[in-house]
């Protein structure tokens, strides 16, 4: 049995939905279909999820939502019209969305989650109706009825372990199951969403619970590429990745697959196959425990901007018990997550995403670090990009860090920081944002000019 997930671009129009139908109908093993909300039909289009977020914001302010409401309905109606379906399903979606907009707003986070989740939920209902219209035995199932329980962390929910046993019952259902992605239910019966693009997570959770043999993730690219095609033209396709490699690359900027979605698949040992809805015959990329193709030490290079660094220096820091704990406590008090923390005997650097800082947060953090740690220096640097060089087999190859550093030096890129974990799956380089693309191209040319991945 396979669990198959379709992203928003694969479900953005009636033409796309018919491609999805063909893919499901041609393979009887594709029993559970996890769906996103309708995505972009063209470059400057607006995703349904974004329309719903804007609609929710207006509703919370008590403003008129009618225009945005109709824009959302029009997206579903356009799909129904393109596929020849009746207005019955659209009337159902209209009533559902109206009820959601009119629901309790005393807790804005819960209200926003209900609004966002309606995008996937109503699309699942529409797709199940379309499959039936085309003659398939297909049924929509609500995550609550399926037993998908999550934590009460709105916009960052985590699956509860008991969900997996409950979801196993999906194997016994007849026909095709259409399952909305992106959200689950708390034990109190409230909707709680995963982080953005969380339908990937739903697919992996359902695949784990149903003990699927394969989790297929259909998107709008032929494969995972060794580097961002917007930075390097015609990059090499990656035919096979390990879970750890994909996790590192997804975290560091690869948008093809949500990094959190790998965890349920990894725990169950379920291979993930990333494929293109618009070109299903393409080989795609498989994510597995161990990859067979080891022709190169580096499998991919990913980059992301929007980071800052806090450098803390104090003589004899290494002898001071609890110094690191005090640093992390100050961050925790401010509600900040840190990404990396490379250190020496007398200094350490904290890497943080800049979008976490409010108007006064930076000043408060800097003051506390200086005063409470009695540090010699505390310096914040903005505009940092992180570049991850990733490959499980790097640990078996001497000189990878040296080659990478030389490639950056030859390209006149200054390395602001470098970090490598003990697992040696990845090497992190910090560079100025304006040098990010130059750095990525230099590293790609160093490791992929003669390599087939």
PLM segments and residue spans:
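A conserved regulatory-domain signal marking ACT and ACT-like small-molecule sensing domains
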Residues: 283-453
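Active-site-proximal loop/turn and secondary-structure-junction residues that shape catalytic pockets
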Residues: 37-39, 183-184, 278, 316, ...
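Short phosphate-binding/catalytic loops that engage adenosine nucleotides
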Residues: 29, 136, 270, 336, ...
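Positions that flank functional sites
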Residues: 146-147, 222-223, 280, 346, ...
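Short hydrophobic alpha-helical runs that function as membrane-insertion/retention elements
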Residues: 214-218, 272-274, 339
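Active-site C-terminal subdomain of aminotransferase-like
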Residues: 271-283, 305
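Nucleotide/pyrophosphate-binding catalytic subdomain
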Residues: 1-258, 262, 430-432, 451
